[in-house]
Amino acid sequence: MDKLPVVSTFWRYVDSMGINQGKSLLTVISILRERVWKQLDLYYGRINISIDTTVETLYGSQQGGRKGHNTKNRGKKGYRPVLAFIDQTREYIAGKLRAGETISGQETADFIYEIKSRLPGCVQDVLLRADGEFCSWEAVAAAKACGFRFIFANKGCTPSFDSHAWYRPYQKSDIEYNDYFYQPMGRQEPCRFVVMRIPKEQETGKPIQLELLEEDRYTYRIFCTDKAGPAHKIIAEYDKRADVENLVGEAKREGLEAIPTGKFKSNYAFFQLVMPAYNIWRYMKLLAVQSEVVSETTEASTSGMKGIGANTLRIARLKMLLIAAKVVMDQNRTKVKYSIHDARTPLMIHFLNFLDEARNKPKAWLEDGGWRQNFAIA
C-alpha cells in the first residue's frame, strides 16, 4: 500500500465488518500479546484479571440499545460492554460489546471461558476479581472449571455470619471482619463468604434513634471467594481491583465510547478494533521503559522517559508522538527534522533507534526454548 485510503473508505470498511471479524481481532490481540511478552522477556506465571462493565450512552436509534443502569444519563438507552484487563501489564485481554442489559449468569460463565482461551502459554495461575454482576453460580462454576481463583462482590446472597467470630485486625479501626461457608439457594455446593462491617456514622447535634437490631448499625461489604486466608487480607486484595475503573475510563477516552454506525454488528467490530490500538500503546510504553533501562549502560539521555510507565496513554503520546517536526525533501530523500530546542527530541531519536535495533534482531517468538506459546503461527 503506497498510501493510506481516505477516511470515507476506512469507514465504509468498518461499516461492512461484523461480529465474526470482531472475534478474529481478539485472536490477533492474543497473538500480539505473546509476541510482545517474548520480545520483552516477560514471564508471568501468576496474573490477576479484573473484570468490569461500563455504560455507553446512545443518542440515536442504534441497534441493541436498551434502557438500564445509567447513573449519568438516567432513562437513556445505551450499550453495556464488559472488559477484562491484566493487572500486571494493564492490557486488555478480553471483552465484547453488549446490548444495554444487565449481564446474565450464563453470559458471565461464557466470558470466563473466553478469558481462559486467551491466556498466554506462560500463565499457570489466575485470580479473577469482579463486581456483583459476576456473583452467580454459573460464574463460580465456570471459574472453578477453568482452575481460576476468584473474588466476586456479593449480590443477592444473604449469608448468616457467626456473631462471635467478628474480629478487628487493626486495633485503631472500628472495622470488623468475619467469614462463613454458605450455600445459597440454587447453588450446588457451599461457597466461602467474607465480610467487613463498618459502623454507620451518627449525625451530631440531632436526636439519635437507636437501631433495634445490631445488623442495622453497620454497613456491610460481602464477597464470595475460594481463596484461603484471613478475611481482611482477601478484601484488601479485592480492593486493588479499583484501578480497573481507571483502565476502562482510559479505554473509553481512547475511542471506545464512539458509536460509529447504527448497526450493532459494526459497532461490535469497532469495539474490538479500538482495543488493539489501546494495547499497542501499552506495549509502546513497555518498550519505552525497556529502552530507558538499556540507556542506563550507554551515554544516551532519556530523561524524558522517566516515569512513562506510570503515565496515562494521553501523556505518553505527548511525550513520544506529538513532537513538532518538519518534513523536507533533500537529494531525492524524504527527511523528518526535529527541533534541537525540544527536550523530547533526544529521547525520541533514542527510542526510534532502540526499535530499529530490536527489529533487526532475531524474532524472540520464533526462537526455540522458553515458555510455550498458545497462539504461535508460522
Regions found by a protein language model. Give the residues of each.
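Short, conserved catalytic/metal-binding motifs centered on acidic residues
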Residues: M1-D2, V6, F10, G45-E56, ...
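Active-site-proximal, Lys/Arg-enriched surface segment
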Residues: K3, V7-L83
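Short acidic, glycine/serine/threonine-rich loops at helix termini
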Residues: Y59-G65, I93-L97, E107, W137-A143, ...
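Electropositive, glycine- and tryptophan-enriched low-complexity nucleic-acid-binding patches
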Residues: T71-G121
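Domain-level cores of phosphate- or acyl-group-handling catalytic modules
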Residues: T102-P159
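An anionic, glycine-rich sequence signature occurring as long contiguous blocks
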Residues: R149-G255, I259, H350-A378
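C-terminal catalytic subdomain
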Residues: I234-I235, R241-T298, S303
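A short, flexible helix-boundary coil/loop motif
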Residues: W281-A378
